[in-house]
Amino acid sequence: MSVVNFYGQLSNTQQFDQIRINIASPEQVRSWSFGEVIKPETINYRTFKPEKDGLFCARIFGPVKDYECLCGKYKRMKNRGITCEKCGVEVTVSRVRRERMGHIELAAPVAHIWFLKSLPSRISTLLDMTMRDIEKILYFENYVVVDPGLSILQKGELLTEEELQKAKDKYGEDAFTASIGAEVVQQMLKELDFPTLKQELYEELQNTTSEVKKKKLVKRLKLVEDFLESENKPEWMIMNVLPVMPPELRPLVMLDGGRFATSDLNELYRRVINRNNRLKKLIESKAPDIIVRNEKRMLQEAVDALFDNGRRGRAAKNANKRPFKSLSDMLKGKQGRFRQNLLGKRVDYSGRSVIVVGPELKLHQCGLPKKMALELFKPFIYSKLELYGIATTIKAAKRMVEAEKPEVWDVLEEVIREHPVLLNRAPTLHRLGIQAFEPLLIEGKAIQLHPLVCAAFNADFDGDQMAVHIPLSIEAQLEARVFMMSTNNILSPANGRPIIVPDKDIVLGLYYLTLAFDHEVGEGMMFSDLTEMEHALYNKFITIHTKIKYRRNQLNAEGKIVPVIVDTTYGRLMVGELLPSNPNIEYKFINKPLTKKDISLVIDLVYRHCGQKATVIFADQLMKLGFKYACSSGISFGMDDMVVPKSKIVHIDETQLEIKEFEQQYSNGLITYGEKYNKVIDAWSRCTDRVANDMMKEIAKPPVSDDSNQQKINSIYMMAISGARGSFQQIKQLGGMRGLMTKSNGQIIPTPIIANFKEGLTVFECFNSANGMRKGQIDTALKTASSGYLTRKLVDVAQDCIITEKDCNTDKGIEVKSIIEGGEVIVPLAEMILGRTAAINIYHPVTNDLILTKGELINESKLEQIESAGLDRIMIKSVLTCESSTGICAICYGRDLATGSLVSEGEAIGVIAAQSIGEPGTQLTMRTFHIGGAATKGAEVSSVEASYDAKVKILSRNVVINSEERKIVMSRNCELLLLDNNGNEKAHSKIPYGARLLVDEGDMVTKTQKLAEWDPYTIPIITEKSGKVLFKDMVEGISVRDVTDEATGIPSKVIIESKQYSRGAELRPRIQLLDAKGEIIMLSNGLEARYYLPVGAVLSVEDGVQISVGDIIARIPKESTTTKDITGGLPRVAELFEARRPKDHAVIAEIDGRVEFGKDYKSKRRIIIHPVDGSMGLEYMVPKGKHVVVNEGDFVKKGDLLIDGNPVLQDILKVMGVELLASYIVKEVQAVYRLQGVKIDDKHIEVIIRQMLQKVEITDSGGTTLLVGEKIDRREFDEINEKAIKNGLRPADAQLILQGITKSSLQTRSFISAASFQETTRVLTEAAIAGKVDKLRGLKENVIVGRLVPAGTGFLYGQNA
């Protein structure tokens, strides 16, 4: 220890628990300083030594060389600590030049630009003046009245030079005091008496009623409280002393050729010093006021440029017209200190190289080029060479390694044995982007990678590169082996499914191997022994595809071996031989042609029942088998494999006839252009699908034997059906028809590409398809960045979400049920509850047996019990309802998807959630590119069919029978349920208004029976009574217009937005129904039969005609459809997580009640909901052009939509509560990903939602010091209330608020984390004023200060510390 001390190498890092940020007082700045910088000079151009008292002065900042003073009088260690009397430099290590600061005594006070210009301006808020006014004072434009004295001037009033002169003439020189510059602002700030000011503001807040004033007062009061609590003085925001950064942190480097490169900061400091010195001289020489003032303003500008260049006025630029990088720029953005150096560091002991496939590797191995290994493991090789006495010193060892002596290679072999290395492929989108492997030394220069881990790395071998990192310490090696080894990462943390799954060629080989053909040689033979079969195969008595019988030994449930005779093939038996013996893994799982899905299922089963080791061995053997048969099968494909179905021409002719009919209807004015466009696109979508289906049938036909008795099966079909290569979409384009293409704006071009790639495209078709292809390319380029940004925001908001305890013992939970859309179960209940915990005891509904106890994990066996019990909804615990004070508890989170067991404490689930949501986003943007712009839109849903044999139940049934004896739905929220024999809901569908109902309440229906149908492209307006039509408020050219179609010349009446009518009355176009006497007909609900028409409605009837019940009197055309792809989806995901108001958002009803249309107001319609209990109704003002989905007299439930569109998330929270908000966000986000076939567990989305719901807004301050309208952390709020109750005070009330992820990240408790995310200057300004303390609880802030993260293995370390 003493030796270490002697050499002064003792680490001087301090142990600390928290970090506090404050405004530095002038005294503090002086105490940091080692001397004042007086001269702007840097170094002497001849001697290259630093100038005395300059910016690099050795006397102030320390010696340039270790233990050597500047003049050279004292050299070496022995003189340590002596200060040279000649040059004044202390003899010490030169490292102090990175630590010692200097200072500049300013000749005039200067405002700190962050407190002046960072919005909201703190100085102007405190002084209750506008920022513009403060600037005028600081930059010497206007004077401010400090003391009005005997004059009638106001305190704080601004005066120009002329006005000041006039006032002096009027009141006399000494009647009042007015001043200018930073001195006066400093004086005004000094005079503020915070306790009194706080009291005054508080009283004013109580007495004011104006909302704007309240907001302003709350802002000011908050700032005053911050200053009081932090003990900062407001006058410190104006600086008298400027700190100077250590010179090594703003270096001056000599370039070749004698020129110097310098940090911009030196230039900025020089300007400050120059101006400061000039100002001192001017003041000493008693220069005229105007010159001094100008110099002070220039000094202010110089200091502004140093702190934040470009924030105010023109940025200071260098000779090349580039703005200087100021102190703020050093912190800000991707290249700033936080993100470039603190969160992302370069790593030593690493290398990178191209990857090639290594099919003979085991799953835990990678091939490392010898050259790389030799370089990376150098320290280990040196120590071993010395240990074995092969080399006497490190130097000798070094020479041996450089000479690549034979013994070095032997030592290298030993060194790398069981020493894992980390492989990383950029971009690392989720944690499986870095995995550990045991290296095998190989010749060549490329890293060999195991094929099965490619999916996790998203790697392919078309030139991808990977980086290798060496864990050095024993702890790092241990963690790499236990947590990061590829064999320990079999399941994906996003959805709990295996990610180590055979893919591409392996799948193809296994599919080929497990095919069974009819009429093969030796069909029906029986075998009891594999060697016997091999013999038969070798002598060509059978083939690998021959259907045979085989006696196979199998484990039964008791674990006894029983022989079973199976109908199988030799190929399938080869796979069967690899299966681990377990009663749960039956032979039937592989006794079929194995597709990618089947293989994934088998691997999952093996993992669940046999454990990790068995899975790894099984996957490795499968891979080898797959590769072998992919090779020997000789599968390839040529032109003839692309079969063009004969029915193609028929389908196309039919569709073209159909389209002619639509054209005719359009010409006759029966449908609008938009409807025609939609119908045409639908027709072509259906045609493309039919052609594609016929093509698939054709290529899937059982193969015919040829002369050599070798059966052929279509290669393309094999590749697609097995999931090895190519999608249905791509094959459709090869042999069917390319179909519809999208324009660059997402619109579908209504003329499809009829040809396919085999037939070849015409020039016109080629031109049309180029459009879509380019869109794919451009999307990929643009959307990757936005997806990466979404991931970054998600990580930032959730980074401090860590499992901190086993159980928070809450009784709360959320109820989940399967998601059913269009009568189809999209997500079964089982999928939603697997790996979650029960919130209550769950019993069998019939036998009343206990299935699950509260807090028990729902695993696969429990799932079977729940399914057999027929439960359709279950209460589960969720992170949303977890009541842990910090972090989240394991029970509320449930299963760790990557291991399949209960999550362990210290798991960083927030980051995992963010990666699971963000990673597919990036993948999906790149996926458009492979289909080449073909439109991926199916035909619109225009009917609903029964998905089961079941009994019909109709909710909100309101039906009229029209003149054609058809049942027409009149309800806006009609739902059709299908019930099984026990009355459990099997499916449910929403039936839109105006649909024809083909069944009724209580009917028994069979599977595929049509239940209802409707026109998907228009929203009809339908009559409930028969009568005569009367048009009201339809004034030609003002509220209704005859639109003559250019193409057809047929006029139709369309409602237009009515401008203010000349008579001053608002027009509300409507149709009324009259009876025979000419009086308005009354409806059953007691209201008049009148139908309001929204803007854009097309009339279907003429004035004065007689109509029947159920007739359509007007249609509202729906907008033409655009393709739904992830590009539409990613912005939607971002919109949801940012909690933005959707464009054209819906309005939702806040109460149950009846709808009434009130008097319109300007361009708004008034909708009133009257509650059933007769209390005060609620009013909604909606823009006139919007389509109102309710009619007068309709009964709406809380949460029903009044206007079409996506609801605003904040509204859902306010009206429906947290649980429904969460389920809405989860459903919407999942819908986007589901469209692309990506599976993400709900709990990941719930973690993010929990982070969005961290803040509450105070509605009533009670007896606490909280202010109404203040937004604070939920936990903080609970703590304050607990204190208040203890002290016998009334607790405060607050409501939960939803914040977007960006806002949540910026308002996190840790200012270090927030500053490193975005808006660095604003965050730090705020934190400094409030004297914030960072407790270092999250991951990011710990990485920044260089400590172990408090998660994973660092979690316990952090707790013990």
UniProtKB/Swiss-Prot annotation:
Cofactor, free-text remark? Binds 1 Mg(2+) ion per subunit.
Q: Where does Mg(2+) bind?
A: 460, 462, 464
Q: Any one Gene Ontology biological process term?
A: DNA-templated transcription
The record's section on InterPro entries has:
DNA-dir_RpoC_beta_prime, DNA-dir_RpoC_beta_prime_bact, RNA_pol_asu, RNA_pol_N, RNA_pol_Rpb1_1, RNA_pol_Rpb1_3, RNA_pol_Rpb1_3_sf, RNA_pol_Rpb1_4
Q: Which GO terms describe its molecular function?
A: DNA binding; DNA-directed RNA polymerase activity; magnesium ion binding; zinc ion binding
Q: Which family does it belong to?
A: Belongs to the RNA polymerase beta' chain family.
Subunit comment: The RNAP catalytic core consists of 2 alpha, 1 beta, 1 beta' and 1 omega subunit. When a sigma factor is associated with the core the holoenzyme is formed, which can initiate transcription.
Q: What does this protein do?
A: DNA-dependent RNA polymerase catalyzes the transcription of DNA into RNA using the four ribonucleoside triphosphates as substrates.
Q: What is this protein called?
A: DNA-directed RNA polymerase subunit beta'
| The gene coding this protein | rpoC
